[in-house]
């Protein structure tokens, strides 16, 4: 191994990988397949790699990320929008696979984003199951919406058959998700804690366990930012705009939205908080986002303290 410390950027496409480093020195173009991953790992093993950054590319990056994490590298899967804004900020307007790899390496060096943890096999499997359930649920919604519009009996029957198949598959996945959680002591306890909060059901719990494994390990500001629920101020001189949320994990945020809608009906603490915001003239979108953030902070505190929900105020929540 050489003693030079490198930040590595990898641009991932469906069939190819472009690799660059900062400081410059490492330039590779490889196939995005097991042989290409092995070649990449062999090259990286010759250097002292501080951080590897890739962009989220619709799932094409996931097998490589698993290989890198399994080998012990610090890995970040960056938001493409954040990386593109960074590129514009450093004056790089051109965009090719090779340039993207160089920008990712420079982003890793200058921004040094927080590396992701290596998920356990149980958590990785759970994440895949939860993602698949979300996909099937989306298909079910589309087919269900088509049914009232279908006038031909044969077409209606066709849609009904597809709906039945999707409902069966979703039910089977629910069983697999439950079995996966029950088979792991850590996941089972975390699930028990999360579902102890009124408004949080099995679906939201499974999403949090699989797609927000940092729950309980970060402070309130960090966990809110990770889910895209941290308000960002917009100010310039004496002018102050409305604070907005931005970025974060969309799937987690969507599930928390549904959980918050339920909580303002059945969870006295969240309902009181929501009504207070309404009495202050807050719009629904602002109030429900605040409820989502409050629920997430409460869940984060409960998991960190390894305790179940109590109507009494929670310290640091």
Model-derived features with residue positions:
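Short linear capping/connector segments at secondary-structure termini
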Residues: 119-124, 153, 158, 190-192, ...
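Helix-hairpin-helix/helix-loop-helix acidic hairpins
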Residues: 147-203, 212, 267, 271
